[in-house]
Amino acid sequence: WEIFFGGRVNEGVVDGATFIINPTNGSSYTWTILQTQQIASSRLRALEQGRWVVQVSPTGFSAFVGPDGAVYDRTGITNRTISEHQISLRTGRTPYSRLGNNAYFWALLVGLAIVIRQRSRAFQRAAS
């Protein structure tokens, strides 16, 4: 379940992980809602970290997720299969890896500052 928590995945990357593995078991959950969320979380972690994610599940979706968030070779629920996909090992850190969730906070602050500045200028022009 660690794939749902960006900080936990980031710890592995900081420690030198060159790809991310997501072993999971969704047997307690009916239908595909949770398994679909896990694939979405794997895509998000791949984008955040610039790494391949290999999701392996005996009861849910198994898949390879590229650093660009593209999903490859996704299996169906409970499909028994052996999947192979060529992945590249990656090093280095993305801005998200360096800033963590603070990246979203800083982006929000910068966006707010731009909006406030533009409104302030418009107000000053209207007052002149």
Describe the predicted segments one by one.
Residues 1-128:
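Solvent-exposed soluble domains appended to multi-pass membrane proteins
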